[in-house]
Amino acid sequence: PIIADVAIANESAKSSAGIVVHENKNNQIDEIFRSMRTNLQFMLNENQKVIMFTSSTSGEGKTFNAANVAVSFALLGKRTILLGLDIRKPALGRLFEISDKKKGITNLLVKENISSNDINAQIQPSGINNNLDIMLAGPVPPNPTELLARESLKTVIDTLREEYDYIILDTAPVGLVSDTLQIGKVTDVTAV
């Protein structure tokens, strides 16, 4: 099903595209993301909360859409976390102007045993809304696909399911790398 239709920006607008969803705004772009959020809620069953954003190729707006839907959920009062799982070409730090790129999920994926404290140490506030947290990709690893295939990804997601209403995953293009196929195993719904 089509959950929303987000306009394609020209190249100059793409480079400055960021967070466009804001509290108490009723413009067209806010309404598009509210509509996407509502349609995603209809697609999810009661215990489902993990939404993966991907595309066929780079530059199609995965990060932009994932981030703005995450903000939209947070503005609804839902505890939301946005995970940077495009660990080859991370972009969330730039979008949210978070400079600490040493924190992130790759620090967890390399571990055998992960505690809640380990996970919480990698989470950062979004700076946009108190209901929205972010876990960046972290240091870029030499073996992204192998790292994402580990059981540690499921452990992280399962732990986050206990703490958050929605978990939004910003991933690599499914048409270019196999990383996203591995992530799909822990996902409840995929938006392309």
Each language-model region and where it sits:
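Beta-strand-loop-alpha "switch" segments that mediate conformational coupling across diverse proteins
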Residues: 1-17, 138
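P-loop NTP-binding module
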Residues: 19, 25-192
